[in-house]
Curated annotation (Swiss-Prot):
Induction: Post-transcriptionally repressed by the FinOP system. This is Protein TraJ. It is found in: Cytoplasm. Signal peptide: none annotated. GO terms for biological process: regulation of DNA-templated transcription. Interacts with GroEL. InterPro entries: PAS-like_dom_sf (IPR035965), PAS_fold (IPR013767), TraJ_R1 (IPR016384). Transmembrane segments: none annotated. The keyword Transmembrane helix does not apply. Pfam families: PAS. It comes from the Bacteria. It comes from Escherichia coli. One of its GO terms (cellular component) is cytoplasm.
């Protein structure tokens, strides 16, 4: 899905080098992984966060999302799609890497000298502020109360949302591109934390349902599939 009508966006009048300098000035020290690649898929600029993200070692026995080459092939296919859409096109997609879920934004930028580049920006997905639970299980936003949702990484949060809705680990693993074991390992520490306040996990699940807190988890799932 393109964010804007490309016909309303004139070609970039600056040079490629000038554009890259502008990107570098903005993202040099940013925690957001960013890179710029040309039509031949050569990296013209990558910040430190991008280099660090894609320097992780492969884990061949942990699923495709742990193999850098597989992830790079998928992202390159998205880049080709962005190039084909032409100047001004921009879209977001989600992908899995090392068991974590990310959202990538790609934007095609073309110049008057017939050069073009694709800007990559990568963020953890999703990134929501979530409610906290106090020891009686009631909903609160007070920072000194027990937090459950707020302590979860984006990847664990999506697994937890599926699990809370009754989806089994095999299906969760298939949907997220991770192993069954990875799905189980993400849920175990959350269940241990919940057990401190609820005798059974299902009591916690029912509590979230009748208090309407389950709606937050449904919104995560809808968001997840909305950018797939």
């Amino acid at each position: 899905m393109c964010a804007l009508d490309r016909r309303e966006r004139p070609l970039n009048s600056q040079s490629v080098n000038k554009y890259i300098l502008n990107v570098q000035n903005i993202y040099r020290n940013s925690p957001v992984p960013v890179c710029v690649r040309n039509k031949n898929r050569k990296i013209l600029y990558a910040n430190g966060a991008f280099i660090e993200l894609f320097s992780r070692e492969d884990k061949p026995l942990s699923g495709e999302s742990y193999i850098r080459l597989q992830v790079e092939i998928f992202l390159s296919s998205l880049e080709l799609e962005c190039q084909a859409l032409g100047h001004g096109s921009a879209f977001c997609r989600r992908f899995n890497f090392h068991g974590e879920i990310y959202q990538i934004r790609m934007e095609n930028v073309s110049f008057y000298n017939d050069e073009s580049v694709v800007l990559w920006q990568i963020n953890p997905f999703p990134d929501y502020p979530f409610f906290a639970l106090n020891q009686s299980g009631s909903n609160t936003n007070t920072s000194d109360k027990l937090t459950i949702w707020n302590d979860l990484s984006p990847g664990t949060l999506v697994v937890f949302s599926f699990y809370m809705l009754g989806v089994g680990h095999a299906t969760i693993a298939r949907e997220l591109g991770i192993t069954d074991r990875a799905s189980e390992d993400r849920i175990k520490p959350v269940k241990r934390k919940i057990k401190e306040f609820f005798e059974h996990f299902d009591l916690f699940r029912v509590s979230c349902i009748y208090k309407g807190e389950i709606d937050s988890l449904l919104s995560i799932i809808r968001e997840f599939y909305g950018v797939k």
